[in-house]
Amino acid sequence: QLREAGVDTTHITWFSTDAKGPFSTDAKGTLMNGINVTYRGKGVIPSKTEYYRAHTAVRELGPGDVDLDKIFVSEGVRWAHTGGIFTLLSPKTAELAVEFMKKAGEQGTLRSFDLNYRSKVEPDKQKAHGINRRIVAETDFLVGNQGDFSDALGYETAAEKGVPFEEWLDAYADMLRVVAKD
């Protein structure tokens, strides 16, 4: 369906159900695409989103599974981006993200990272901090808000809640300087 719609699938790793090779699953197809289901709220009942990522195929990718030389050397990709959801899906994806960012940096490729912390993906914030800080160390352009910097990396602003905006902004800028230095 992707190819029929004109989407370039050259870099997609296809998983098979023949139980042969590194990207294989059993005949039952226990690997699947991750899906999100959102229940619409009504009245005082808020909406709720459920994520089904437990057996998502991308969770199985790890270091060495993607031809990074082809991407960054042969094809000359100039911008590499990853995000906090992918990096926290599994220990393998975390290691792949670090490998990806390092390889991009070796080739002078601009590297960006969207913190995009989701507690439903990794509820252990200390674990998330450790993984994300390794990736941030390899990043040129970091995307996040105050909550992301706190939840994904463990950085807090020194401003008390309810302070004037200018005071909060100064404290936020100070926190960003610490993140950049670290």
Predicted regions span which residues?
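Anion (oxyanion) recognition and catalysis
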Residues: R3, K102-E106, V136
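Short, small-residue-enriched loops and turns at beta-alpha junctions
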Residues: V58-R59, L88-L89, S119-E122, D151
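Conserved N-terminal subdomain of the carbohydrate kinase-like
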Residues: Q1-G84
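Active-site beta-loop-alpha junctions enriched in small/polar residues
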Residues: A54, I85, N116-K120, G147-F149
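Surface-exposed amphipathic alpha-helices with a cationic face
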Residues: V98-G105, A180
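Active-site glycine-rich loop that binds ribose-phosphate moieties when present
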Residues: E60-L68, E95-E99, Q126-I131, D170-D174
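Conserved phosphate/ATP/ADP-binding segment of small-molecule kinases
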Residues: Q107, V121-D182
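Hydrophobic beta-strand scaffold residues
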Residues: T9, R111-S112, V143
